[in-house]
């Protein structure tokens, strides 16, 4: 059975693993998911990620980050643009998340990037999710 929203599945797996304080979580891999994991690592929300090859699509292993080994760094991770209701923003209307404490992840013509990078480049795109 195919999945309707693989990005929402990735975010839900990360959210659930954070709640039970798992050190790592395995997610079916895709290029978009790897790019989202790369942004999360650059912004310091996860420790690391690794793509493990198998005979199918591969597995994206995400190593979660905790403060003092008990509190997760990611407080909230929310999907914004969904398959049934896409959300697009231009560079002037990219939202500020939690007064600048969080980030928005956008899919732009230049690739997947944070809200700050998109504002600096002057481009908009699809608002994938917010993290803080």
UniProtKB/Swiss-Prot annotation:
GO terms for molecular function: rRNA binding; structural constituent of ribosome. GO terms for cellular component: ribonucleoprotein complex; ribosome. GO terms for biological process: translation. It comes from the Bacteria. It holds the Pfam family Ribosomal_S8. Keywords: Ribonucleoprotein, Ribosomal protein, RNA-binding, rRNA-binding. One of the primary rRNA binding proteins, it binds directly to 16S rRNA central domain where it helps coordinate assembly of the platform of the 30S subunit. Part of the 30S ribosomal subunit. Contacts proteins S5 and S12. Belongs to the universal ribosomal protein uS8 family. This is Small ribosomal subunit protein uS8. It comes from Trichlorobacter lovleyi (strain ATCC BAA-1151 / DSM 17278 / SZ). The lineage of its organism: Bacteria, Pseudomonadati, Thermodesulfobacteriota, Desulfuromonadia, Geobacterales. The gene is rpsH.
